[in-house]
C-alpha cells in the first residue's frame, strides 16, 4: 500500500494551507479509483532494435491519462514494485504477477499492450531507409484490478513517423474505457502531442531506461536534437546533478519552461544544484517557485534553508514546514536552530525537545539542546567553529515524484469539489478561467475538461464557448473552432471569439472577413494587443483594416 498512503499527511497539510474544509477534503478523498499503472508494451515485431518503442508507451500514456484526470504511477515506483517482488527490470509479467504488482502500488487499473512494426520499402523499420514508410499497429487492454476483469482489445495504427499520434489515440480510447463519462475529443489528445522529432524521442526513451555513461550520452543526444524538449532537459539535468556537475545541471534545468508540468520537479533539482554551488539566492528562488504552486513541507523547508544560508531570518518558513508535518524531526531541529539565531531560546528548546522525542539518537539535536541549556535566556546563536559547535539547518535532497503528484492530484480533487458547491454562474466563470490558464500552458486536454465543466454549469456562457473555440483552434480543428466562436458571439459580442474567427479567415485567405472581425474586436477593446498584432499582419498582406 506504499503508493497512496505514504504521502497522505502532507496532502492533509496542503488542504489546511489552502483552508479547505474537512468535508470538502473527505468528498475528494472518496473519489478514488483512478490510479493507473501503465506497463511497457511487448514488441511483436521480431526486431529487438524496436524495444524502445515498448518502453515509450508508459511515458506518453502517463502524460495523456494524467491530463484526463487519472493518477498515473511513475517509472520509479514501477521499478520499486519490481525490486520489492524480486523481478528484473525487463520482466514481462503474467496476469497473476501483474495483479501482484498493481496491489503493491495500489493501482485500480493496469494498461497492458503490444505492438508490431511492418517495415517500409528500402530497409528495416529502425533504419533510415524504411522508417518513413513503416507502419505500427498497436493493441492495448485495460485490466481492472477492482473488478478483476480485462477489457476488449483497443486497437490503433499509424505510420511509424506518427508514433505520437498513435500513442495519443490509444490513450484517448483507454481513458474512455476506464471512465465512461470521459468526454474530451480525440482531436484534443492528438493536438497535445509533443513537437519532438522521433529520433530525439528515441534517444530520450533509451536514455531514461539506461544507466551511467549510456544514459548521459542518450539524454545529451536528445537535447541536442530538440533543445527545448522539457522531458529530456529534466532528465539530463537530474543526471548531471547526480554526477555532481552542479553548474551544468543548473544551466540545463533552468531551461525547462515555468509553464510546463515538469517545472516543479525541474526547479526542485535546480534549487539543489544552486544550493550545492553556494548560490543560495538562486536556490531560494527555485524552491520558492515550487512552493508557490505546491507548498509541500520539504519544499518550504528547503526554501527556508536557502534563506538561512544568506544570513536572513527563516523562522516563519521553518515553522510552516514543521506545522505541515509535525512528525518530521528534521523540521523541528531546523526550526530550533532558526529560533536560536533569533534569540528565542525558549522556543528553540521546545523545538529541539520535540525533535529528540521523535528521534532520541539524534546526536546533533542533543548537542544543540546542551548548548541551549548553557546560555542565558535570549542569547542569539553565534556559531563557534573553534569548539566545533556550528549547527546548520538540514536540507531535503530527494524529490519524491510520487508525493508531489499525489498531492497535486488530491488538490485537483479538492478544487473540483469546492467548485461544485458554487452557484452555476460563478462555477462557470471559475472553470472558464482555469481552462484559459491550462490553454496558455499548452495543456489542451486539461483545458477542454474545464471548458466542458463550465458549459455544463452554464450552457449559455459566451466566455466558455469562446474558450472552447480557442481550444479547437489550438488542437487543429478549424471547423469546430468556427462553430464555437459563432455560438459565443450569438450570446455576447466578445474579443476572444472574434479573433478566433479572424485568424481562421486569415488562414483561409479571406482577408476582407478577417479585417471586419478585427475591426469589431478593436471596437470592443481598442488596446487589445492580440487584435493590434493581427491587424498589422492583415495590413501587411494588402488588406485595409478600419
Descriptions of predicted regions:
Residues 26-34, 59, 68-71, 97, ...:
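C-terminal/domain-edge helix-coil "capping" segments
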Residues 28-100, 104-129, 145-153, 189-196:
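Short beta-strand->alpha-helix linker/helix-N-cap micro-motif
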Residues 196-231, 235-245, 400-403, 426-453:
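Alpha-helical segment of the N-proximal tetratricopeptide repeat
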Residues 201, 231, 265, 298-299, ...:
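Start-of-helix register in tetratricopeptide repeats
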Residues 210-217, 242-255, 276-289, 307-320, ...:
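Structural signature of tandem alpha-helical TPR/SEL1-like repeats
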Residues 227, 261, 294-295, 326, ...:
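Short coil turns that delineate tetratricopeptide repeat
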Residues 235, 269, 302-303, 334, ...:
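Canonical tetratricopeptide repeat
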Amino acid at each position: 500500500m506504499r503508493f497512496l498512503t505514504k504521502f497522505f499527511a502532507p496532502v492533509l497539510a496542503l488542504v489546511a494551507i489552502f483552508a479547505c474544509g474537512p468535508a470538502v477534503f473527505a468528498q475528494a478523498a472518496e473519489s478514488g479509483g483512478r490510479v493507473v499503472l501503465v506497463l511497457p508494451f511487448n514488441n511483436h515485431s521480431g526486431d529487438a532494435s524496436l524495444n524502445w518503442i515498448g518502453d515509450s508507451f508508459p511515458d506518453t500514456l502517463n502524460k495523456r491519462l494524467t491530463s484526463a484526470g487519472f493518477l498515473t504511477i511513475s517509472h520509479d515506483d514501477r521499478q520499486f514494485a519490481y525490486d520489492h517482488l524480486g523481478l528484473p527490470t525487463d520482466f514481462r509479467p503474467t496476469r497473476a504477477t501483474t495483479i501482484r504488482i498493481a496491489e503493491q502500488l495500489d493501482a485500480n487499473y493496469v494498461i497492458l499492450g503490444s505492438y508490431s512494426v511492418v517495415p517500409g520499402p528500402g530497409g528495416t523499420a529502425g533504419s533510415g531507409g524504411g522508417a518513413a514508410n513503416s507502419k505500427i499497429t498497436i493493441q492495448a487492454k485495460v485490466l481492472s484490478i477492482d473488478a478483476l476483469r480485462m477489457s476488449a482489445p483497443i486497437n490503433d495504427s499509424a505510420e511509424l513517423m506518427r508514433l505520437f499520434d498513435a500513442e495519443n489515440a490509444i490513450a484517448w480510447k483507454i481513458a474512455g474505457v476506464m471512465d465512461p463519462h470521459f468526454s474530451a475529443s480525440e482531436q484534443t489528445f492528438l493536438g497535445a502531442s509533443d513537437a519532438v522529432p522521433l529520433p530525439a524521442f528515441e534517444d530520450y526513451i533509451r536514455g531514461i531506461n539506461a544507466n551511467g555513461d549510456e544514459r548521459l550520452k542518450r539524454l545529451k543526444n536528445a537535447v541536442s536534437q530538440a533543445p527545448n524538449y522539457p522531458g529530456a532537459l529534466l532528465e539530463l539535468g537530474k543526471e548531471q546533478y547526480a554526477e555532481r556537475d552542479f553548474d551544468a545541471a543548473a544551466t540545463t534545468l533552468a531551461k525547462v519552461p515555468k509553464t510546463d508540468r515538469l517545472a516543479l520537479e525541474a526547479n526542485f533539482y535546480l534549487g539543489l544544484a544552486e544550493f550545492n554551488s553556494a548560490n543560495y539566492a538562486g536556490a531560494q528562488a527555485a524552491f520558492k517557485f515550487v512552493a508557490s504552486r505546491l507548498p509541500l513541507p520539504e519544499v518550504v523547508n528547503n526554501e527556508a534553508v536557502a534563506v538561512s544560508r544568506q544570513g536572513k531570518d527563516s523562522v516563519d518558513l521553518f515553522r510552516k514546514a514543521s506545522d505541515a508535518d509535525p512528525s518530521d524531526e528534521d523540521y523541528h531541529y531546523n526550526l530550533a536552530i532558526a529560533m536560536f539565531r533569533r534569540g528565542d531560546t525558549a522556543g528553540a528548546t521546545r523545538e529541539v525537545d520535540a525533535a529528540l522525542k521523535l528521534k532520541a539518537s539524534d546526536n546533533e539535536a542533543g548537542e544543540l539542546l546542551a548548548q541551549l541549556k548553557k546560555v542565558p535566556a535570549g542569547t542569539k546563536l553565534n556559531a563557534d567553529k573553534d569548539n566545533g559547535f556550528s549547527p546548520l539547518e538540514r536540507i531535503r535532497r530527494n524529490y519524491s515524484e510520487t508525493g508531489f503528484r499525489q498531492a497535486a492530484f488530491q488538490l485537483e480533487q479538492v478544487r473540483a469539489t469546492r467548485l461544485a458547491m458554487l452557484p452555476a454562474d460563478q462555477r462557470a466563470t471559475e472553470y472558464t478561467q482555469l481552462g484559459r490558464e491550462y490553454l496558455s500552458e499548452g495543456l489542451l486536454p486539461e483545458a477542454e475538461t474545464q471548458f466542458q465543466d463550465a458549459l455544463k454549469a452554464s450552457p449559455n456562457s459566451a466566455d466558455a464557448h469562446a474558450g472552447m473555440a480557442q481550444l479547437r483552434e489550438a488542437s487543429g480543428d478549424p471547423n469546430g473552432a468556427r462553430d464555437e466562436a459563432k455560438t459565443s458571439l450569438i450570446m455576447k459580442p466578445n474579443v476572444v471569439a472574434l479573433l478566433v474567427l479572424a485568424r481562421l479567415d486569415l488562414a483561409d485567405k479571406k482577408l476582407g472577413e478577417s479585417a471586419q472581425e478585427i475591426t469589431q474586436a478593436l471596437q470592443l477593446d481598442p488596446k487589445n494587443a492580440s487584435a493590434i498584432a493581427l491587424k498589422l499582419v492583415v495590413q501587411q498582406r494588402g488588406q485595409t483594416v478600419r
